[in-house]
């Protein structure tokens, strides 16, 4: 009798584990099934929007979806826009998950227009544009043409490095306001440089990326490990002139997507260098995010952790998606808290799936609703934005790979 009960208990345990594993995997497969239908709808929406482009817009290479405008229309942007690489990146992720050449051909089509950015020395967003598009394409196809474009892009990006400052300059605009602005977002563009160092054998790319990351640790973070958005430097002395926000609530507030950029960036920097200060920084940022008294129970933050009218403030789904991506990878390195990091990432994906997803064959083909571009300037507030979708698919891929292969690296 005892043996029978033991066998029954063991069977129930295995059944429970199998059910949980299947349920966890289902969130990935179901979301990719949804995304396949939704992105096919997006192609129709894009074609419709393209039909209304002016000759000037066509000449300026307007092609990629970015967000839904206040009037409900689909906004398409040119390759020079910092968001131009996310939609082709989504298509590469669809190809990676499905293996269907339909997505590969579409990814190739939407990646091609970004090539002209490889010589654009006026942008720091080369990683967002080129690594998300050509980077994923090269990883999945091995196309040597893509490799050459990426190396040229990396060479262009490092022309913005200011040796006296120890950082890559971010924006060129508002020169009456800033001398050498560096934004926390720029941590995300370092991955292209680490890749270029390995691919070319030239250490200059890695050295610049490491210097930028170290300088950012020194000057961007407060004592509680929340991050400023913009740090402005004197180009002659390298001294800090100002610490500001541009997209957050105030200069001393914690803009939620900025915290996510930092977390993702330092997790990636640890992967590429093995330097403990980068892992420590990522862990500190996690501590700030998840100890914030304003973080909602569903782990989808308000657009700024210090926004004045919480809980009556918009959420930023994009910040949650980026955070989930970082947590899956961080769980590989921070062994002591691995389960906690993964559980939090899983909870974020569950929240996004249940409560923030777009309606099928609606919402101009976007996957997620309720992101905020810049609450400070009332721009792209509580709307679908393309980078939320990109990092949502990335997080799903990382979850699937982590559970199947024990690694979140794509």
Language model features: what each stretch is:
Residues 2-8:
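Sec-dependent signal peptide recognition
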Residues 10-12:
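Short, linear, compositionally biased motifs with a strong N-terminal bias
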Residues 15-16:
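C-terminal motif of bacterial Sec signal peptides marking the signal peptidase cleavage site
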Residues 21-410:
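Glycan-recognition and catalytic cores of secretory/periplasmic carbohydrate-active enzymes
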């Amino acid at each position: 009798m005892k043996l029978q009960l033991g066998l029954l208990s063991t069977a129930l345990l295995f059944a429970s584990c199998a059910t949980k594993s299947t349920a966890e995997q289902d969130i990935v497969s179901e979301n990719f099934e949804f995304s396949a239908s939704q992105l096919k709808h997006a192609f129709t929406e894009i074609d419709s929007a393209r039909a209304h482009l002016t000759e000037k817009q066509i000449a300026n290479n307007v092609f990629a979806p970015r967000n839904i405008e206040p009037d409900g229309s689909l906004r398409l942007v040119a390759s020079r826009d910092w968001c131009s690489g996310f939609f082709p990146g989504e298509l590469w992720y669809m190809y990676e998950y499905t293996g269907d050449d339909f997505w590969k051909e579409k990814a190739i089509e939407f990646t091609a227009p970004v090539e002209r950015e490889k010589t654009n020395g006026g942008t720091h967003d080369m990683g967002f544009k080129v690594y998300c598009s050509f980077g994923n394409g090269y990883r999945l196809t091995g196309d040597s043409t893509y490799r050459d474009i990426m190396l040229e892009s990396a060479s262009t990006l490092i022309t913005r490095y200011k040796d006296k400052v120890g950082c890559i300059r971010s924006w060129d605009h508002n020169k009456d306001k800033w001398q050498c602005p560096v934004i926390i977002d720029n941590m995300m563009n370092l991955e292209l440089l680490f890749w270029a160092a390995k691919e070319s054998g030239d250490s200059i790319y890695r050295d610049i990326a490491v210097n930028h990351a170290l300088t950012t640790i020194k000057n961007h973070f407060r004592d509680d490990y929340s991050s400023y958005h913009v740090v402005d430097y004197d180009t002659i002395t390298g001294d800090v002139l100002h610490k500001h926000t541009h997209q957050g609530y105030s200069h001393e507030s914690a803009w939620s997507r900025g915290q996510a950029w930092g977390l993702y960036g330092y997790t990636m920097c640890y992967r590429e260098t093995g330097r403990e200060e980068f892992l420590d920084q990522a862990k500190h940022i996690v501590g700030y995010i998840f100890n914030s008294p304003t973080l909602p129970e569903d782990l989808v933050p308000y657009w700024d952790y210090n926004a004045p009218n919480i809980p009556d403030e918009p959420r930023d789904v994009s910040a949650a998606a980026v955070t989930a991506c970082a947590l899956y990878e961080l769980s590989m390195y921070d062994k002591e808290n691995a389960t906690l990091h993964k559980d939090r990432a899983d909870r974020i994906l569950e929240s996004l799936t249940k409560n923030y997803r777009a309606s099928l064959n609606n919402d101009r083909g976007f996957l997620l609703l309720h992101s905020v571009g810049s609450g400070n300037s009332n721009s792209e507030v509580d709307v679908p934005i393309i980078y939320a979708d990109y990092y949502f698919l990335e997080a799903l891929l990382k979850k699937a790979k982590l559970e199947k292969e024990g690694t979140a690296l794509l």
